[in-house]
């Protein structure tokens, strides 16, 4: 039975409490919610639909696929008014997901039937993609492969961590692009090529898919999946708004990562978000960084550091520097010493997150020894640099950072004849 889900709407997110798990009490649902067909409310167009459609504002018409997921409450209110409804109907716009063969189930919320019908006739739809494949690692990490409406595939990862009190923190690692154009030398994602930017709803739906798979609300979101978020900033910011305002994930629970794209850190700072900026540094000097990150040639290290300092001054939010440790390349104590000197030169509002390299097929890089990792961290700490070592998660699922690629990404377009993964094939960790 299809899961009935609401479009991002803050009043209803609050009304339902645990946002991803609740359906009306009179409706039962099975675990087959992960086998959703593309969520659509489209019905055959009639002559009346064109008039309803033409009344939409240019701002909403720019959403060429007419997707409701990710629209702000103000956009939904505007849409309701343009369809002759009251403002409140925009806020109350609960759109029904369809099951296979277009079977529909109604949730007990007062949305006028006429409004739903007009939306259907005008071609509006929810905007959810089916899960094409799912892999679960021994540590409970789950990688989902979502099939977009243009048959392209994106990956998102759910990372569960249980604290000492037994509470679970669930982090969704989301993609911002289909593939990545930057081709960092140690990263698997760039080897699969680049197709296009993701739309806002295609980012938001990744979080919803993780919630549905784990049957648990997502507590943290990191833009560290496929792609460079700063090259798709408009969609990332719109998705950020939806995740924060509508799905109610705190801004401080959201991290936006970048390898460094000129002028974009300044632009992000101007929005004064309270989210963490994570900069993929990977080297303590420009020469070594260019060897590891080819795109660094267009964005000198000093310029990045200045922009990071300005980001802190603008937002009062500490910057996190991601540093992938590559054995024999950038993992020596001398590199740690040089990194500490660099950071002290530009201020102290920084944190270094060390990431031992995750081996990928065809790469010449090696994972550093535990001793090398410990020595690097100790060298930073002795120089009063705040440091953490990222726990490697999901190696079996090829889901750890730098591993967002599998056999499907080598041929990113899925044939129409390919079947979406069935319920029985999906491994779920609760």
Q: What is the predicted function of each stretch?
A:
Residues 2-154, 160, 168, 309-317, ...:
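Auxiliary Fe-S-binding modules of radical SAM enzymes
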Residues 76-79, 203, 236, 304:
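Hydrophobic/aromatic residues in well-formed alpha-helices
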Residues 134-137, 175-176, 257, 280:
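Short linear Ser/Thr-Pro motifs
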Residues 142, 154, 169-174, 182, ...:
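Generic beta-strand structural signal
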Residues 158-159, 235:
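Residue-level structural signal for beta-strand termini and adjacent loop
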Residues 162-202:
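Canonical Radical SAM [4Fe-4S] cluster-binding loop centered on the CxxxCxxC motif
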Residues 191-220:
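Conserved alpha-helical substructure of the radical SAM core
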Residues 211-383, 388:
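Conserved AdoMet/S-adenosylmethionine-binding subsite of the radical SAM
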């Amino acid at each position: 039975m299809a899961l009935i889900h609401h479009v991002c709407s803050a009043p209803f997110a609050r009304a339902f409490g645990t946002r991803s798990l609740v359906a009306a009490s009179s409706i039962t649902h099975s675990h087959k919610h992960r086998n959703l067909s593309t969520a659509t409310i489209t019905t055959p167009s009639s002559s009346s639909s064109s008039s309803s459609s033409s009344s939409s504002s240019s701002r909403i018409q720019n959403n060429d696929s007419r997707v409701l997921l990710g629209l702000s409450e103000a956009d939904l209110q505007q849409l309701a008014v343009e369809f002759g409804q009251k403002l409140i109907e925009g806020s109350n716009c609960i759109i029904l997901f369809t099951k296979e063969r277009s079977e529909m189930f109604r949730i007990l919320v007062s949305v006028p039937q006429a409004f739903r019908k007009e939306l259907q006739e005008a071609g509006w739809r929810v905007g959810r993609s089916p899960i094409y494949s799912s892999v679960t690692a021994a540590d409970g990490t789950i990688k989902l492969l979502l099939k977009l409406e243009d048959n392209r595939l994106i990956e998102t990862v759910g990372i569960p961590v249980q604290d000492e009190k037994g509470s679970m923190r669930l982090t969704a690692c989301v993609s911002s692009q289909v593939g990545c154009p930057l081709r960092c030398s140690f990263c698997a994602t760039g080897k699969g090529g680049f197709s296009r930017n993701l739309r806002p709803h295609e980012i938001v739906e990744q979080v919803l898919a993780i919630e549905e798979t784990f049957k648990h609300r997502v507590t943290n979101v990191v833009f560290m999946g496929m792609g460079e978020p700063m090259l798709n900033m408009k969609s990332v910011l719109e998705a950020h708004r939806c995740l924060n305002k509508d799905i109610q994930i705190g801004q401080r629970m959201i991290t936006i990562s970048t390898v460094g794209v000129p002028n974009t850190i300044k632009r992000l700072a101007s929005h004064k978000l309270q989210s963490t900026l994570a900069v993929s540094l990977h080297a303590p000097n420009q020469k070594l960084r260019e060897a590891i990150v080819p795109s660094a040639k267009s964005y000198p290290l000093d310029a990045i550091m200045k922009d990071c300092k300005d980001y802190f001054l603008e937002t009062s939010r500490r910057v996190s520097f991601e540093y992938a440790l590559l054995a024999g390349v950038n993992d020596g104590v001398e590199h740690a010493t040089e990194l500490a000197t660099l950071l002290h030169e530009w201020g102290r509002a920084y944190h270094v997150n060390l990431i031992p390299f995750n081996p990928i097929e065809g790469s010449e890089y090696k994972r550093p020894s535990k001793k090398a990792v410990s020595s690097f961290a100790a060298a930073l700490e002795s120089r009063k640099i705040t440091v953490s070592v990222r726990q490697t998660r999901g190696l079996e699922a090829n889901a750890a950072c730098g591993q967002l690629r599998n056999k499907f990404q080598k041929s990113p377009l899925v044939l129409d004849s390919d079947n979406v993964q069935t319920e029985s094939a999906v491994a779920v960790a609760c």
